[in-house]
């Protein structure tokens, strides 16, 4: 079973003679912490290659596609084409991520010290759904969102650039039912700070349908708290029909949540 939006899949193998790896908690990773990558760069003749590095950043998004669900661990352990799907371990031997991509200078496919791994906590969530249902069911708010820039921050009386601006509220959506309005700026979900629109997308989609979710937002310069009951996130084709926007306008305005 596969989940293209997260770039993850679950396969069934014969377990005879195999032991399972210990799964860590990627939420406990810190910038500067040592990690170890294992994979097969440039083909199977280099299989079981082990490299080491440190966590450079956490919560990276919009690396591969704004339409995907991304919350990457950025690290500098050497990974290259062929490492995708390989393990990222902490120094306790716990699996904390799945290596999936690298950033390059645009001229070479070789490692430049900027690698990205899917955090194991996201992997667990996707894995559980794929095994039980064959698909991933994500929470849905029913809004169109965009990042906060300097001009919008001034216009909406914000103290900083954190958060995500509501540019559209879908009719009869969970957001509308909860009282979310256009030009609200969501700054936290269940007490977790929202950095930008991609971060909000991840926080909402990591919830389950029917979850009671607390939103902290700024409206007319004042902080307000709302509780929303998440819906079931539609498929991409259904989303396109629901939001009634062409792709060109969608690219300008931001993300669907």
Describe the role of every protein-language-model region.
Residues 2-6, 57-63, 148-150, 233-235:
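Short, conserved beta-turn/loop elements at beta-strand boundaries and strand-helix junctions
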Residues 18-20, 38-53, 59-85, 90-134, ...:
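Active-site loop architecture of trypsin-fold serine endopeptidases
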């Amino acid at each position: 079973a596969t989940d293209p939006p997260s770039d993850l899949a679950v396969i069934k193998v014969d377990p005879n003679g195999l032991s399972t790896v210990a799964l860590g908690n990627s939420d406990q990773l810190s910038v500067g912490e040592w990690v170890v990558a294992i994979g097969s760069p440039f083909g199977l003749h280099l299989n079981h290659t082990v490299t080491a590095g440190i966590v450079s950043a956490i919560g990276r998004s919009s690396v591969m596609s704004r339409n995907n669900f991304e919350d990457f661990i950025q690290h500098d352990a050497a990974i290259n084409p062929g490492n995708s799907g390989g393990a990222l371990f902490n120094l306790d031997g716990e699996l904390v991520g799945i290596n999936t991509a690298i950033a390059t200078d645009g001229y070479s496919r070789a490692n430049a010290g900027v690698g990205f791994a899917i955090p194991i906590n996201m992997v667990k969530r996707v894995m559980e759904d794929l095994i039980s249902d064959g698909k991933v069911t994500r929470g849905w708010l029913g809004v169109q969102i965009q990042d906060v820039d300097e001009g919008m921050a001034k216009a909406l009386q914000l103290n900083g650039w954190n958060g995500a601006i509501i540019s559209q509220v879908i009719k009869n959506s969970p957001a509308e039912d909860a009282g979310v309005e256009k030009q609200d700026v969501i700054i936290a979900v269940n007490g977790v700070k929202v950095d930008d629109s991609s971060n909000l997308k991840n926080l909402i989609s990591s919830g389950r349908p029917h979850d009671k979710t607390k939103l902290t937002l700024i409206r007319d310069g004042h902080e307000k708290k709302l509780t929303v009951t998440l819906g079931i996130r539609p498929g991409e084709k259904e989303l396109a029909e629901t939001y009634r926007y062409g792709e060109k306008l969608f690219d300008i305005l931001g993300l669907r949540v």
